[in-house]
Amino acid sequence: MDTATKTGYADVLVGLQYGDEGKARVVDHLAAGYDVIARFNGGANAGHTIATSEGILRLRQVPSGVLHPRVSLYIGSGCVIGLRQLASEIEMLAGQGIDLAGRLTISDRCPVVQPAHFLSDRRDGGRIGTTGNGIGPCYADLAARMRGGERSAFQLCDLMRDESRVFEQMMRLAAQRDDEDIAVLIQEMRQAWQVVRPFVTDNPVALLERVEGGARVLFEGAQSVMLDVVQGAQPWVTSSHTLPSYAYVGGDLPCRYHRKTIGVAKAMVSRVGSGPLPTELGAERSEAYCADAGREGRGRADEAARFDPRALLAQGDAFSTGIAIRMLSNEYGTGTGRPRRVGLLDVAQLQLAIRQFGVDEVYLNKCDSLAVFAQTRDRCIPVVVGSRDGNAMHVMRFPAFDESVIPRDDATPLPPQLETLLEWLADVLGRPLRGIGLGPQRAQMRLFKTQP
């Protein structure tokens, strides 16, 4: 990494909708301009995907700058650590020739997900659509501090001091909640800890020292602002703070170094699990269908076997259109494989998020998915711009474009229909569009120096 002589800075990147906006691919494109990519919230419930020419790289806890060998990676104290998942991820990356030694640093203040947390989440989390990775119970025990006269939460620093005592206490806590044999889980965690331990630091100003030396940091948010534990719609939220301002608490850096906030959205809204999705295609019917599919373990393969997306589009009803869009744009959860509920782009929601959370610029992924509407009866792209009376949605319609005119390289101009839509969107959002996604591959991201 280049050695800078002046004080560095930090930017924060967050999702502006309900998750799965393609934040990782934007981080991957921006990473070369930073010295450190840092995570500040969440844990193994985050599914970040980077599509490369060699295949798909799926990450849950390691920051998305892994493909840039000169970039350091940091997991801040606001994240919870699933030892088994993180160790598996580190080993998976090593198997692909990506060595994290000397690159990855983890705060020793990160809480550890315990067997009791997995068991609790899998028993109680299904109704609100959690991933079952124990994230919520881990954060809850961190806040509770004590249960039954004993500590209820442990951080990596506790393992550093006395791992045997901590694992023994974790076993006792789990045994109080479930009859399942916990010994196997504890043994797997002991083994995973040996993989994770070399990356843990007890230096609370590790990231600050880098920035004081000139390092440029990009904080990578997990989940999205609409799922924030406070600002989101309870109880259908994640269990951590997802907002840009929290990056400096969970990322272990004073906020004085903040430079700008980057928001990522996508041209079709989607959501995994239960909770409000005002523009959902198929409304309650779609929500119930996706909930049943999640409980029964049905996803991409099941829908591919049952449905022809083009036939669904020809039917013309919102529910069928939603299934078709999900199939054609691969809207299935990265971390879970569950079908995502699909809705129209909600411009009013984006406007509020941008204003409320201080977003300076926007990236819009999945613009290629809008070509689906060329196969609908009216051949128009519907965009929700608000409600007239609190109930009926006000929808604007833009001419659709065919999939065949989507550019495959930067030299090919955008379809005029898409260009018109993007210019309008940048104007109503009041923020510059810095880039758009035109397909899943790394090369299918187009960056703008000026407005499209």
Curated annotation (Swiss-Prot):
It is an enzyme of class 6 (ligase). Pathway: Purine metabolism; AMP biosynthesis via de novo pathway; AMP from IMP: step 1/2. It comes from Cupriavidus pinatubonensis (strain JMP 134 / LMG 1197) (Cupriavidus necator (strain JMP 134)). One of its GO terms (cellular component) is cytoplasm. Its EC number is 6.3.4.4. Keywords: Cytoplasm, GTP-binding, Ligase, Magnesium, Metal-binding, Nucleotide-binding, Purine biosynthesis. Plays an important role in the de novo pathway of purine nucleotide biosynthesis. Catalyzes the first committed step in the biosynthesis of AMP from IMP. It is found in: Cytoplasm. Belongs to the adenylosuccinate synthetase family. Mg(2+) binds at D20, G47. The keyword RNA-binding does not apply. The active site is at D20, H48. Its cofactor is Mg(2+). One of its GO terms (molecular function) is GTP binding. GTP binds at residues 19-25, 47-49, 340, 366-368, 437-439. Homodimer. IMP binds at D20, E21, G22, K23, N45, A46, G47, H48, T131, R145, Q223, T238, R338. Substrate binds at T334, G335, T336, G337, R338, P339, R340. This is Adenylosuccinate synthetase 2. One of its GO terms (biological process) is 'de novo' AMP biosynthetic process. InterPro entries: Adenylosuccinate_synth_dom1, Adenylosuccinate_synth_dom2, Adenylosuccinate_synth_dom3, Adenylosuccinate_synthetase, P-loop_NTPase. Binds 1 Mg(2+) ion per subunit. It catalyses: IMP + L-aspartate + GTP = N(6)-(1,2-dicarboxyethyl)-AMP + GDP + phosphate + 2 H(+).
